């Protein structure tokens, strides 16, 4: 019966693991719903900010803000990469890093260098091993990120752009499509892309105090911050969705392993009982 005992021990071990993965699945599902609510709450703010920028720029067309002007030559670009701090979320980070590596190869073909600003321990570790140029690194934002913790690294990248160290700035993060699907997305932060006429839903005829140019300086800064914050919040929702799916898959796989081990255990136990009966019958016949 020693073989049956070993199988029984394995079954108990897998059952304990299954309880853990099931609990993690339920926790991730709860956190995902809260992250989705935050994500949906921040989207209208970012969209309205684009409208405000378009109206302010239109109110003073002679004012050329550096965040709105295309540069003739692009020698270096900055990538703000948002990953997770923890694992157990399937291929979420791997797919994101593959997208970044592809972009790096494309920029390298054009002779353009890349500087990084990373959010999340996974991105910091990956690009650290890669030996990439990292200007700012932030970790430990948690499941409920706060904008105050992001302002520092954002300012580092904005200063690099203002000083001409980088000529474009991009945001790379996971885009929440639905619970089962998350995709790596890249959006240009600087220079800010022109606002489409469709986004300018209303004609504003305001007198600005202070001037439109002064307001534009502050609004552009807030816009960049809101875009990064939106990316971080959306990435949290992606992380929780991916972890929920990964843990559900692990729980289901554990169930299959338990079923297979139970079958092995039953066969081993049946074989042991059959052997004992055979020995008893043989002993009785001998007597």
Swiss-Prot record:
Q: Record's superkingdom?
A: Bacteria
Positions of disulphide bridges? none
Could you tell me which SUPFAM superfamilies the record lists for this protein?
Answer: ATP synthase (F1-ATPase), gamma subunit
* Sequence similarity: Belongs to the ATPase gamma chain family.
The record describes the protein's role as:
Produces ATP from ADP in the presence of a proton gradient across the membrane. The gamma chain is believed to be important in regulating ATPase activity and the flow of protons through the CF(0) complex.
NCBIfam families in alphabetical order = ATPsyn_F1gamma, PRK05621.1-1
> What name does UniProt use for this protein?
ATP synthase gamma chain
- Source organism: Alkalilimnicola ehrlichii (strain ATCC BAA-1101 / DSM 17681 / MLHE-1)
Taxon lineage:
Bacteria, Pseudomonadati, Pseudomonadota, Gammaproteobacteria, Chromatiales
State the encoding gene: atpG
């Amino acid at each position: 019966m020693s073989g049956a005992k070993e199988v029984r021990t394995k079954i108990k071990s897998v059952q304990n693991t299954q309880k853990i993965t099931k609990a993690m699945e339920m926790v991730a599902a709860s956190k995902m719903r809260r992250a989705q609510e935050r994500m949906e709450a921040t989207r209208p703010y970012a969209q309205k900010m684009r409208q405000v920028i378009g109206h302010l720029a239109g109110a003073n067309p002679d004012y050329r803000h550096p965040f709105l002007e295309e540069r003739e030559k692009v020698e270096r670009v900055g990538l703000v990469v948002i990953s997770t701090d923890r694992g157990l979320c399937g291929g979420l980070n791997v797919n994101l890093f593959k997208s970044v590596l592809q972009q790096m190869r494309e920029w390298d073909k054009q002779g353009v260098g890349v500087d990084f600003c990373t959010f999340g321990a996974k991105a910091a570790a990956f690009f650290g091993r890669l030996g990439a140029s990292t200007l700012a690194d932030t970790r430990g934002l948690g499941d409920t990120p706060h904008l105050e913790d992001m302002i520092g690294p954002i300012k580092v990248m904005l200063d690099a752009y203002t000083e001409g160290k980088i000529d474009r700035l991009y945001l790379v993060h996971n885009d929440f499509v639905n619970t089962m699907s998350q995709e790596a997305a890249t959006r240009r932060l600087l220079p800010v892309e022109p606002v489409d006429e469709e986004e300018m839903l209303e004609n504003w005829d305001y007198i600005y105090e202070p001037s439109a140019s002064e307001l534009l300086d502050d609004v552009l800064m807030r816009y960049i911050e809101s875009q990064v914050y939106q990316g971080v919040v959306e990435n949290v929702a992606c992380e929780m969705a991916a972890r929920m799916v990964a843990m559900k898959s692990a729980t289901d796989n554990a169930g299959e392993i338990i079923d297979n081990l139970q079958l092995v255990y039953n066969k081993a136990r049946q074989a042991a009982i059959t052997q004992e009966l055979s020995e008893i019958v043989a002993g009785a016949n001998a007597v």
